[in-house]
């Protein structure tokens, strides 16, 4: 796959080192998602068999697929080019603390609202296009409903395991890979680059196709924030907050705060 090299100084606000071809862009955005899907399809029945919801397979995929592949690819690129990881992962411009806090709050709230407004579309898509997906492969099963199918102990073990994996490690590595590596290398698309990056990022979640639309709504403001400020620290914090908020909500469901106490 061809790339077009240009010049890059050590300052990440400078010109991008290379521009990926469309083919390479598609492959690098979607390949990790394909690998996660294969892992998920293989492991979901196993975790189901020992009493865990399907999402436990996603958390395991973060450990055995997402982090090793995405971080490993970045390290490989650094070694291949005889440079440091810092020259591979771009968009690392510092943002003044006050601006950072304000921007994070705005992007978090904005993304949360947009995602929530688009949730009904997800439900329509799920009912009309993916109603055939078995419960054992539905990542929402046992979280937002049917919690009685799983023991409280199993759900809490899953939640504790997912906290460092899905709230910290996964988002940090994904932001390094998607917004720090891939986004700068499609900068030739200008203002459309974050949109393309976000659509492909949402599609990369092949294991959860129902959430495609709302995921775009949630992550698009964040991607534009990182692109505008040339700082993955912005998107990294917002991404962590998204996943942390989801984790808190899931914990409340497990504990029966919103109804249905699990068995």
Describe these PLM feature segments.
Residues 25, 55, 69, 140, ...:
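A general marker of short, structured functional hotspots
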Residues 112, 143-263:
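Transmembrane helix-loop-helix hairpins at the membrane interface
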Residues 124-155:
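Membrane-interface interhelical connector segments
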């Amino acid at each position: 796959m061809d790339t077009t090299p240009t010049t890059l100084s050590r300052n990440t606000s400078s010109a991008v080192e290379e521009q990926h071809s469309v083919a390479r862009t598609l492959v690098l955005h979607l390949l990790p998602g394909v690998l996660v899907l294969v892992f998920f399809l293989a492991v979901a029945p196993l975790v189901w068999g020992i009493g865990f919801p399907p999402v436990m397979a996603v958390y395991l995929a973060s450990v055995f697929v997402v982090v090793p592949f995405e971080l490993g690819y970045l390290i490989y690129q650094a070694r291949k080019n005889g440079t440091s990881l810092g020259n591979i992962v771009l968009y690392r411009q510092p943002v003044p603390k006050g601006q950072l806090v304000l921007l994070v709050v705005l992007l978090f709230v904005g993304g949360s609202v947009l995602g929530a407004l688009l949730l009904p579309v997800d439900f329509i898509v799920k009912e009309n296009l993916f109603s055939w997906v078995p419960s054992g492969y539905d990542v929402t099963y046992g979280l937002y409903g049917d919690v009685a199918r799983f023991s409280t102990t199993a759900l809490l073990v899953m939640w504790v395991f997912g906290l460092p994996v899905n709230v910290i490690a996964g988002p940090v590595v994904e932001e390094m890979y998607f917004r720090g590596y891939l986004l700068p290398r499609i900068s030739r698309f200008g203002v459309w680059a974050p949109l393309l990056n976000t659509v492909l990022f949402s599609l990369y979640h092949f294991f959860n196709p129902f959430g495609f639309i709302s995921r775009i709504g949630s992550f698009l403001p964040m991607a534009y924030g990182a692109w505008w400020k040339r700082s993955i620290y912005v998107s990294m914090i917002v991404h962590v907050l998204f996943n942390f908020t989801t984790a808190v909500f899931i914990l409340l469901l497990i504990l029966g705060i919103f109804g249905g106490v699990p068995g």
